[in-house]
Regions:
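Terminal amphipathic helices with adjacent charged low-complexity linkers/tails
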Residues: 110-166
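Glycine-rich phosphate/ribose-binding loops and adjacent secondary-structure elements
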Residues: 1-81
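Active-site or pore-adjacent capping/gating segments
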Residues: 45, 53-120, 124
């Protein structure tokens, strides 16, 4: 989260935000993660391992050895025969992620993901009674709104695209 927040803040301060598409990756598992990443400035979200788990991966970390015991990550016919995954399993997972993100945004009064992008004011640090030391963390720099009342997300500007791409 810190890197994402710092990238967003730096791009805004230097008036470069409309020239970059910010993508986040690693550790995204649910709709809440999407909403948090969007509020911190992410516009695109990559899912890796969790999508494989939705297909049936049991996470034995043997992908590179070509002997995945459930056939998710292998070309060996012996192991491929064990694969029971379907496209619907992954579709159902992502439908759930999208539904959860929409529910959270609705509670915040946000209608679209674009309205959420780059607005850390929707986030607040919560108290964690079961982990007292976590309450000592100062998330102020991560949740800082460096340029209040500014449109934080406008997508990559057309003028910039026209300068770097020939028609």
């Amino acid at each position: 989260e810190l890197g994402l927040s710092e990238a967003q803040q730096t791009l805004l301060i230097n008036n470069l935000r409309d020239r970059v598409i910010v993508r986040t990756d690693g550790g995204l598992r649910n709709g809440k993660d999407i909403v948090i990443a969007a509020a911190l400035g992410a516009e695109e979200f990559n899912f890796g391992t969790i999508a494989m788990i939705a297909m049936g991966c049991v996470y034995v970390r043997k992908c590179h050895l070509n002997n995945c015991p459930v056939g998710v990550a292998t070309t060996d016919p012996k192991f491929r025969a064990k694969f029971k995954g379907t496209p619907e399993m992954v579709i159902n997972f992502f439908d759930g992620v999208a539904r959860e993100a929409r529910e959270i945004m609705a509670k915040l009064g946000v209608r679209t993901l674009d309205e959420m992008i780059g607005h850390p004011e929707y986030l607040k640090q919560r108290e964690v009674p079961e982990h007292p030391k976590a309450n000592l963390l100062d998330l102020g720099p991560v949740l800082k709104d460096v340029i209040p009342d500014l449109a934080k997300h406008q997508g990559v500007g057309e003028s910039y695209l026209s300068r770097i791409c020939k028609a």
